[in-house]
Regions:
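Sec-dependent signal peptide recognition
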Residues: 6-11
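Hydrophobic helical h-region of N-terminal Sec-dependent signal peptides
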Residues: 13-18
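C-terminal segment of classical bacterial N-terminal signal peptides
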Residues: 19-28
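Compositionally biased intrinsically disordered regions enriched in Thr/Gly
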Residues: 2-5, 27-368
Length: 368
């Protein structure tokens, strides 16, 4: 790991914004995606229903993933879709979450507000662009129910929390040697407890302030030049905004003159009722044995991922384990250099609530 990598990670930790999360390379994110995988199994057309009406467009199943045509989102659901010919990029959605899809004749790369995770995988099939149903559920405010027997997916608008989410920019002076582009979400709502609203906003703003403090600490060392100016910035995405729960992904970026930039990703999950920052134990309270299952399963997955390479062995979840919540379930986040090589990217593992909770059990018990 380079000197600048260590500086960035140390500065972030010193700023107190990452509860155990260190900086990781940005290459996985800047590629804006997971590589297009070869389509090995494609099922016949799938019926799509929107608010009870059958749409003319058809979905497809690829390797077990239900894929929805982007054209149907525009033409039938009324979701804004635009195209930038210069960058060959589609923008899907409006508001605080937008999908960006970079498409070529055979590949398609997708991110949400500049953030890519391993659950994102767009497809180009017979000249049409498709995105997985899970992206609609997790980031575009659309509920989706899959009926395997009828080969039908039913879409409807999600019942989101009655809050407003507005991006804010942290004032910072850029110059020829450094660029700061630091933003963070702030929430408001007439039904929110004012103290809870303030507590949540304070945590998110403090995260942004920590990025700026870390950048200024590095800049004070005087190594930046006009030929290779430094950069400090971030992106955020709203991963869950339902049931009185808000989960936010914050992703920070730095470039300090090395061969490549660096990123760090952190999840924050809040109860809107009181502003409490939730731990994994709060989300999965209905299953007192969740750690036993996750520790065993993660060890198996990480051991397979390492394939004998010399990285640290996974032992157990951290007391303040980094995670975020989506409609798809809970995503456990680790740092790149802990368990995997640079080329792998940020190791993340998503588990559905059905996997983590007993039958009939619900997440967020006592928090909503």
């Amino acid at each position: 790991m380079s000197k600048h990598t260590k500086k960035w990670g140390s500065a972030l930790l010193a700023a107190g914004i990452f509860a155990g999360v260190t900086a990781v390379p940005v290459s996985y994110i800047q590629a804006a995606s997971t590589q297009q995988q070869q389509v090995t199994t494609q099922q016949p057309g799938i019926t799509i229903q929107w608010n009870g009406k059958t749409l003319p467009a058809k979905g497809v199943q690829v390797n077990g993933s239900t894929m929805i045509p982007v054209a149907a989102l525009r033409d039938s659901l009324g979701i804004p879709v635009s195209y930038d010919a210069k960058t060959a990029t589609y923008t899907v959605g409006s508001g605080y979450n937008k999908l960006y899809i970079m498409a070529s004749s055979s590949d398609a790369y997708v991110n949400v507000n500049g953030i890519n995770t391993r659950s994102m995988d767009a497809k180009q099939i017979a000249g049409k662009l498709y995105i997985p149903m899970s992206l609609l559920k997790d980031y575009l405010g659309i509920d989706a129910q899959w009926n395997a027997a009828q080969k039908t997916v039913t879409l409807s608008k999600s019942q989101l929390n009655p809050i407003t989410i507005v991006p804010q920019t942290l004032p910072a002076s850029s110059n020829a040697k450094v660029s700061y582009k630091i933003k963070y979400p702030q929430i408001s709502g007439s039904q929110l407890n004012p103290e809870a609203q303030q507590a949540i906003n304070n945590v998110l703003k403090k995260h942004a302030e920590g990025i700026l403090a870390a950048g200024k600490k590095i800049m004070a060392e005087g190594e930046a030049t006009t030929e290779r100016p430094y950069e400090f910035g971030n992106d955020f995405a709203i991963a869950y905004n339902k049931d009185g729960i808000l989960s936010v992904i914050m992703q920070d970026y730095s470039y300090t003159g090395g061969a490549h930039g660096m990123t760090a990703r952190k999840g924050y999950t809040f109860s809107l009722a009181d502003g409490k920052l939730l731990q994994l134990s709060d989300v999965l309270k209905a299953n007192p044995n969740y750690k036993k299952f996750l520790n065993a399963d993660l060890k198996k997955k990480i051991d397979a991922l390492q394939a004998g390479e010399g990285f640290g062995k996974f032992k157990e979840l951290a007391a303040d384990q980094n995670f975020y919540v989506t409609n798809s379930g809970v995503t456990i986040v680790f740092d790149l250099y802990d368990y995997a090589p640079y080329a792998y990217g940020i190791p993340e593992f998503t588990y559905s609530f059905g996997q983590l909770l007993p039958q009939g059990g619900k997440p967020f018990v006592g928090q909503i």
